[in-house]
């Protein structure tokens, strides 16, 4: 029984280039500048790609907090993370920093972002400014497939 996933092999994208990354989850969307004014067709296709692949990646983007929030608002109202203070002018944006002297990573263990809330958000947006050449991994899992595998 398929409970959510779109048949991504049959999804046609006319305005964006979508490259699946793995069989279970994820795709990279290319040739889109998220800080520019995006028309409804492009936004609709980005949303369809999100529904089809559950995690989407956009490389080489240049976001300021204002443009990041503006892009997020195209898909719903951003929430304020309840446990960590966000930026002063953009409380919906939570900076995550790890210094060389820090022993633990933010989140530290496998977790899901705010899905415990009564009305959880549709997703999480992560904008990496600086990442190490090795390590620093953020991992994702497809809970739809995990649920299907139970039966």
Segments the model singles out, each with a brief description of its role:
Residues 2-151:
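Non-heme Fe(II) oxygenase catalytic core, chiefly the N-lobe of the double-stranded beta-helix
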